[in-house]
Every structure is written in C-alpha cells, then in structure tokens.
C-alpha cells in the first residue's frame, strides 16, 4: 500500500476515481465489476481505454461512489484478473478527460512529431489525413449496468514511427521489398501473417532494432512499440511473425532480459491463422475467411454492427483485443486515400 500511495497524485486531485493498468487485453467491464465486488461503482463509471485504432491499451478508469470506497479499492493493488496482476493508481475524472480530448493532430491541423505520411516509411501507425477516433459507446459491450466511456471520446494517442534500421533489416533479411515497418507495399503480398507476441516490461528507450535482436535468430516482420498519450513509450509492444510456429518459438524468450529489464511475453497467435486481406477488404490482421471483421485493431474498418469486432480476432472475428461498438460507424484509424500498405479499407 505504501508503494501505491507514493506513486499516486495528490489526495485533493482524487474524486473517487482509480486507474487500472495491466488488464488482460480481452478484459470486459463485467470482469472489472467482479474484481471490485462489494465496492460501489457509479453508473457509467468504467472506461476501458483504447488507442486511436480501437485496440485495448490494457488500462481502465473506474469511478467509485465515494473517495473512501476508492481508497479501499487501492487495497486490491497487485491482485489478479485472469493471469494478469493489476496495478491500481489514484486518479480523477479530469485525468480521464485529459486522455480523451482529441488531439489537434488527429483533426487535420498541424501534424505532431509522431505523425508521418501515409505512403512513406514509418507511416504504419502515424495518423493519416482523415483519421478519426472511434467513439466509445456509453453502456457498451452488452453490459446492462450502463458502464461506458467518458465524453464519448475514443482513446490514447497511440502513435508509432518507423525506424530505418529495422526497415533495412526486414527488407534485406527477408527480401520482402517495400518499407518493412510502416510500409507502403502491396496489401495482397501476404506480408501480414497475423501471428503476434505481445511484450511487456520493455526498457522505455527500447527500439525496433532492440526488439528484433531480442528475438534473434527469429526474424519478426513487424514491430509496433506502444506510445502513450504523453508521447512516451509505455513499455509494451506487439511483434508479428510469419508463422504460428515462429510466434510459439519466440515465447521461449519469456522472462529473458533486455538490458536491465526482464520481459514478459504473451502469445496472440493460433495455428492456421492467415493474412487479413480476405473477404471484402476489411481490416488489418483479421484471420480466416470471408467477411472477417476481426483482425488487429480492425484498421480502417467501419463499424459493421457486431459488438465484438476488434483485433486478435478468433476465426469468426469475434471478441478480443480492442472492441468496436455495434453499429458505431466509427473509423479505426482510417488511412488517407493515397495510403499504401495494408492499412485496411479505403
């Protein structure tokens, strides 16, 4: 508890709100309610944060009925949901609003330092012209209690940018052509295998090259380092491999060290998962078959009416990492009309 108190903001900033970190990426609001069983949460009091592509960040805000209840909630710090231990920090509604005020660079104004041209090197997660937040629906995910988002805003400004060295490694080492990380290659080339390993505990200065070297002699084909709303690395990353077997082999590196940090790995791959460009050209890294609305964050996809459309999709495209609201009509990080690579539906 002393650790929790030292790593939280001043007492007068709290209004009964806490921030959770380390949630399982398929975590639902119902699971959070169960985690805090016996502690009263206000209506519309749970916000599952997403990045601008509609993917879960593994964090959430929970507003309790009083400051006293929120203080009791801090006592559950380091308890588990599923296989993940949960970190809990004191927060406030103003902090939630700060995360979800749409940044100017997403609205077509002056680009920020992490925004890159869609068709150029490093454009993979840079916000393109016309990209928008997927708005969070109040009371979504089928939970009748009405827990929902805050001010209907989407999620973190989760930007990434390419690294020339990693581009060269991918291009030269695998003969893929185009631009490896953030590339503008042909979307039908089979470049996207849909086999991922999620990394947690990275040194905050870790680069794509560091991650590629960590998995040597395996060769990842894509690395995405998570960037938080403050423009800093979160210590997490997603790494794509060509085959399920490569992704499984990469798990042998679980708990190995990178510099002074030991790295936790989580497998997000299934045997036989294919590339995500099937069906009607819907999004991203979806797996298996026509009309798969799943995939890795459903990039560039409009809401198609099913409640669970987000990435790390199972073969039927339901559930998982980053949920989209049923019939929301929102875009999950749509690329510009001239965008290259796999960025999804144009």
From Swiss-Prot:
Protein name stated in the entry: Heterogeneous nuclear ribonucleoprotein H3
Primary location recorded for the protein, binned into one broad class: nucleus
Subcellular location: Nucleus
Coiled coil regions, renumbered to chain: none
Molecular function terms, GO-annotated: RNA binding
Annotated crosslink Glycyl lysine isopeptide (Lys-Gly) (interchain with G-Cter in SUMO2) location: 6, 67
Residues modified to N-acetylmethionine: 1
Protein species of origin: Homo sapiens
